[in-house]
Swiss-Prot record:
Annotated spans, ACP-binding: 245-249
Catalytic center residues: 112, 244, 274
Any single GO CC term annotated in Swiss-Prot or TrEMBL for this entry: cytoplasm
Annotated domain remarks: The last Arg residue of the ACP-binding site is essential for the weak association between ACP/AcpP and FabH.
Top-level enzyme category: transferase
Enzyme Commission designation: 2.3.1.180
Keyword Hydrolase: no
Species whose genome carries this gene: Rickettsia bellii (strain OSU 85-389)
Gene3D superfamilies linked: 3.40.47.10
Pfam families, A to Z: ACP_syn_III, ACP_syn_III_C
Record's protein name: Beta-ketoacyl-[acyl-carrier-protein] synthase III
Family (UniProt): Belongs to the thiolase-like superfamily. FabH family.
Length: 317
């Protein structure tokens, strides 16, 4: 038994900050940002717009797209690094907003790899027969973790949410396989310099960009090659490759190593920057809304995040 995605939705806050606008208060410019990242703009949530609020907007769109009753949902997983509060979880607040009494809900924290981790967890839970319909969300207010004087990091991130509804598959569609990995020894490559038990603050993002670029390409490449090999697939079988939308240079280098044709690679980072765990479901929602995905298409997800955490998922639409 496996599960399949029956609906998806994305949400980006209305406030948009272009590279030119960013250059008014950060020592940078549009050409510098575009050349190094491929990003042209990012969306920024308002001061009173929290992760749970943007998660709700994406969840409502996914529920509508799946054409199900909200009461069919029997589990909620929210993948986030930027919860409203240290506790309770974003997922439990979302459960309340949706009016789902007693439905188990929890947050999953694997940073930018969170959605891929969530896919594996959701698939395992549905495959066990314990749950039938899972709401899986990636939602982030990454701008709350930015040092706006650090041009190496503040240009990279944005706020947003993406969501999917997963149900048991009774045919050959759905999650074919997935893999997830971690390497805690590499945590200093990307982290925040704060935390509740460390200093009582959320901290700001610290990143070793060159090391992260190299490891991102290396780890995702290895994960994908292993996943394809274990399931007797080749790159030529892939109809759409949806990688984590962190940086277009990472995406292009990974696609080059895999020898994936450019028209199969989904790139949305230009319009919303790195939304961490929300980036893959946002990209999926964008391409689904375009009408390009057909039943039977083979889709590949891959992501890497702080931790380090990384992994990939293969599915048949």
């Amino acid at each position: 038994m496996t599960c399949k995605i029956i609906g998806c939705g994305g949400y980006l806050p209305p406030k948009v900050v272009s590279n030119d606008e960013l250059a008014k208060f950060v020592d940078t410019n549009d050409e510098w940002i575009r050349t190094r990242t491929g990003i042209s703009q990012r969306h920024i949530a308002g001061d009173t717009e929290y992760t749970s609020h943007i998660a709700l907007k994406a969840a409502e769109k996914a529920i509508a797209d799946a054409d199900i009753s909200v009461n069919e949902i029997d589990l909620i997983i929210t993948c986030t690094t930027t919860p409203d509060n240290s506790f309770p979880s974003v997922a439990t607040k979302l459960q309340s907003y949706l009016g789902l009494n007693n439905v188990p809900s929890f947050d999953l924290q694997a940073v930018c790899a969170g959605f891929v981790y969530g896919v594996q967890v959701a698939n395992s839970l549905i495959s066990s027969g314990k749950y039938k319909t899972i709401l899986l969300i990636g939602a982030e207010k990454m701008t709350s973790l930015l040092d706006w004087e650090d041009r190496a990091t503040c240009v990279l991130f944005g706020d947003g949410a993406g969501s999917v509804i997963l149900q048991r598959s009774d045919d050959n569609s759905g999650i074919i396989d997935s893999n997830i990995f971690s390497s805690g020894a590499d945590y200093e490559i990307l982290y925040t310099n704060g935390g509740v038990s460390m200093n009582g603050s959320s901290g700001k993002i610290i990143m070793q960009g060159q090391k992260l670029f190299r490891l991102a390409v290396e780890k995702m490449h290895q994960s994908i090659e292993e996943l394809l090999r274990n399931n007797n697939f080749t790159v030529n079988d892939i109809d759409y490759f949806i990688p984590h939308q962190a940086n277009v240079r990472i995406i292009n280098k990974l696609a080059e190593l895999l020898n994936v044709e450019d028209h199969k690679v989904v790139k949305t980072v230009e319009k919303h920057a790195n939304c961490s765990a929300a980036s893959i479901p946002l990209a999926l929602s964008t391409i689904k809304a375009s009408g390009k995905i057909k039943k039977g298409d083979i889709i590949l997800f891959s992501a890497i995040g702080a931790g380090l955490t990384w992994g990939s998922a293969l599915l048949r639409w």
